[in-house]
Amino acid sequence: MSCAERATYHHGDLRQTLLHAAVRHIREQGTEGLSLRALAREAGVSPTAPYRHFENRTALLAALATEGFRELEERMRAASVDAERDPVAALHALGCAYVEYARTHPVKYHLMFGDLIGDFSPFSELLDAAETCYGRLERVLALGLEQGLLRGPDLQELGGHTWASVHGIAGLVIAAERKRATQPDLPIDEIRPLCAQRRVLESPERAVARLMAGIVIDDGALAALRRRTGDG
């Protein structure tokens, strides 16, 4: 850790310093070996100092996931600001924002949607952040249903299907990015699944739009969506 980073502790920012260090550790080494004591050594503070902010390792991971949901919700909110006027365009922008967040913040994304933390209920801030984030998607879908632009038996099922679709795209994008970074000489053109994965990475916006085509029932909205992504 640099002198500047160490200095942040003395200004009362140890909590954020530990969170940044945890992301760096997970990105470089995975979660194995991650502990509050190890992070304390990296921050140059006493082994007990992190416990003033986090009860245990799981609490620290929950804080990272909470931060992630709040960041994602901000991006989804910005993407869907025009949802009342055009729910379909807003849904596409929201889906693209979701995928882009996953691509640029894979550590937090895996904590948010993986099973490392487990039950969210002991962490009220995490639970609230996750529900607020999902509420952004639900609001746009509800507007689309109300305006007769989207098909779906009910809001809950439509939400699950839409989330699953975009989540799948995000997973492929993360995997393709990782392979490109760690295996640059991999003969992707000779491996059909990896070639398909790369195509999604090259144009996630088009992938989101094509999946949305299955739930958009308004011809005008569908045509506008295709024009927006150069797909028609």
Regions found by a protein language model. Name each.
Residues 100-101, 107-139, 185:
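Short secondary-structure transition hinges
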Residues 14-22, 39, 64-68, 72, ...:
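Generic hydrophobic, amphipathic alpha-helix propensity
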Residues 26, 61-68, 112:
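Alpha-helical DNA-contacting segments of helix-turn-helix folds
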Residues 67-91, 122-131, 140-142, 146, ...:
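Amphipathic alpha-helical linker/stalk segments
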Residues 17, 28-59, 63:
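Helix-turn-helix
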Residues 77-108, 159-162:
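Hydrophobic alpha-helical connector segments
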Residues 2, 134-147, 171, 175-232:
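C-terminal peripheral helix-coil segments that are non-catalytic and often amphipathic
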